């Protein structure tokens, strides 16, 4: 499926880049970062002791220079995002094309991960997609902190199927953010029959420098038809690191300063080779120059 497709049908302007605003957990932050040029947002879903999604909250510690405790309820978040991503809605923002849910599953017992996935799918069906009544169109990336919680993904997909909404499977992909072994991640995904719509990240908090060795390894895997179709880096705030990330061939980055990435993409070195992704760019296709 997506992993096998050639993303070369849109070569105008070069590789599409997902400019993902970091830790966007209340309405004010959402509006602020969209105004700064983000085309995607990354938001933190925290869970209660039963593994049910409760609120958008990162918690302490978080990236340097950011407030860690901004929050809103999960259902209020989904409802607001539905409005922002529905053409014709008064609040519609055409540039918001992808929502990455950073699922804080390390606090959830492993045996609850499957039911957590079902619960998140159910709430998205009811509040974001409104069981087919909503025109909300964003692509969704389920970002899992460790491959040890991969059953969350199965639960999510199984719930879409059992509720009769397999069509939303086309809108949903997965990502694993734990900097785990890439080969092992690929093997586990294959064993779970998760074979498409896969992103792979590498990174660390903006407070700490990280070498790009693993990022480049992931990009090499992507380009040799590995399990992932997109590779992104986090959290990237410095202009110099943004440039290095683009030169390495990444498909996007999480940043606290999306306006800086917009500026870098307009620099002479990058403006012909990269561009901000739009809704017409399929996030589940591997880009071929």
Swiss-Prot record:
Question: What GO terms are given for molecular function?
Answer: lyase activity; metal ion binding; phosphoric diester hydrolase activity; toxin activity
Required cofactor names: Mg(2+)
Per the UniProt entry, the signal peptide is 1-2
Give its E.C. classification number. 4.6.1.-
Q: Where is the active site?
A: 22, 58
Q: Name one GO biological process term.
A: lipid catabolic process
Cystine pairs annotated here are 62-68, 64-207
InterPro entries referenced in this protein's UniProt entry, alphabetically: PLC-like_Pdiesterase_TIM-brl
List UniProt keywords, sorted A-Z. Answer: Cytolysis, Dermonecrotic toxin, Disulfide bond, Hemolysis, Lipid degradation, Lipid metabolism, Lyase, Magnesium, Metal-binding, Secreted, Signal, Toxin, Zymogen
Where primarily located?
A: secreted
**Which residues are listed for Mg(2+) binding in this entry?**
42, 44, 102
Q: Which SUPFAM superfamilies match?
A: PLC-like phosphodiesterases
Q: Name one GO cellular component term.
A: extracellular region
Q: Which family does it belong to?
A: Belongs to the arthropod phospholipase D family. Class II subfamily.
Protein name per its UniProtKB record:
Dermonecrotic toxin LarSicTox-betaID1
Q: What is the lineage of its organism?
A: Eukaryota, Metazoa, Ecdysozoa, Arthropoda, Chelicerata
């Amino acid at each position: 499926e997506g992993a096998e497709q050639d993303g070369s049908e849109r070569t105008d302007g070069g590789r599409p880049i997902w400019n993902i605003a970091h830790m966007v957990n209340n309405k004010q932050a959402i509006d602020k970062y969209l105004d700064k040029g983000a085309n995607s947002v990354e938001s933190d879903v925290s869970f209660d002791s039963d593994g049910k999604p409760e609120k958008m909250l990162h918690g302490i510690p978080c990236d340097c220079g950011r407030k860690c405790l901004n929050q809103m309820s999960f259902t209020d978040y989904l409802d607001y995002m539905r409005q922002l991503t529905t053409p014709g809605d008064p609040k519609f923002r055409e540039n918001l094309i992808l929502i990455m849910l950073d699922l804080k599953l390390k606090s959830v017992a492993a045996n609850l991960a499957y039911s957590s996935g079902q619960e998140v799918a159910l709430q998205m069906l009811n509040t974001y997609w409104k069981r087919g009544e909503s025109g909300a169109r964003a692509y969704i990336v389920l970002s899992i902190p460790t491959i040890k919680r991969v059953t969350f993904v199965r639960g999510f997909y199984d719930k879409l199927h059992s509720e009769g909404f397999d069509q939303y499977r086309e809108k949903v992909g997965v990502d694993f953010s734990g900097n785990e072994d890439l080969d092992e991640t690929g093997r586990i995904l294959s064993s779970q029959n998760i074979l498409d719509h896969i992103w792979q990240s590498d990174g660390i908090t903006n407070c700490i420098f990280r070498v790009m060795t693993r990022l480049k390894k992931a990009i090499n895997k992507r380009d040799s038809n590995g399990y992932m179709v997109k590779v992104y880096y986090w959290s990237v705030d410095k202009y110099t690191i943004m440039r290095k990330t683009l030169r390495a061939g990444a498909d996007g980055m999480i940043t606290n300063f999306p306006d800086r990435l917009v500026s870098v993409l307009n620099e002479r070195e990058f403006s012909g080779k990269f561009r901000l992704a739009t809704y017409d760019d399929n996030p589940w296709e591997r880009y071929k120059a």
